[in-house]
Every structure is written in structure tokens, then in C-alpha cells.
Amino acid sequence: MTEQQARIVAFDDVPPNRRRGGDVRALLTPTTAGATSGFMGVAVVRPGERISEHYHPYSEEFVYVTAGAFEVDLDDVPHPLRTGQGLLIPKDVRHRFRNTGDVEARLVFHLGPLAPRPDLGHVDTEETDETAPAGVVS
């Protein structure tokens, strides 16, 4: 029997993170849910908005689009991604998401395994209006 408990976390329970563009909310994490092998969240991106380029040196990222349409750049190569499609982003692959439609777009993401420390899990490679200088690890 496991000591870990099931945990439900609502979208509105987590404050938005807008530092990289969009409204990104990490819902099920080590902090919010006691996760031990990865974390899951949701991103909401308005038309014309983007999530800035970054990569994950320790984790694969699994993405599923629940609404709208994106263009995702994978190491500078653009790929269309629409409602009902999933995407696997291998570790160390630079990626950014742009909402190419005229309605709000939403995606669910999961990253695993976890980095040794949270500050090592995400490397920014470009600035947005709300980010620190490029190359800052967060």
C-alpha cells in the first residue's frame, strides 16, 4: 500500500504563470499534489499570443491540445498542432507554442521525469515581455 494520497487540484486553485507568455498553470506537482515522477498542467493561450522558446534538459514533455490551434517550433522547425492531437517533445529539444487561430487555445502538458531540482528543469532561450534575460534558468 502506498503512502501517497490521491489529490484533486482545480485550475482556479493555481495562480497563472505568465512569465513565458500565455496563462500556464502547473496543477499536479510535487508541491501541489505530492507528485514524485513528473508534473502536469494546462496552458491557455489567446489568439496571436505565444509561449516563449525553452527546453527541458531532464524531461520529456507530453502535450495534448484540447481547444484551438497552435504552431509549435521544434528546434526552429514549425509544425501545426490542433485540437485532438498529441505531441511528444524529447528532452533538450527547444520548443515554443504560438496560437495561430482566432480563438483561445488550450493544451494539457506533462513533464517527466522530474529534474534533480526545480530550477534545473526549464531553460529559457528567448525573452518575452514578462521574462528575465534569455539563458536564465528557471
From Swiss-Prot:
This is Protein SchB. Belongs to the SchB/CurC family. It comes from the Bacteria. PANTHER family: 16.7 KDA PROTEIN IN WHIE LOCUS. Signal peptide: none annotated. Residues 42-108 form the Cupin type-2 domain. Residues 118-138 are annotated as: Disordered. CDD domains: cupin_TcmJ-like. It comes from Streptomyces halstedii. Pfam families: Cupin_2 (PF07883).
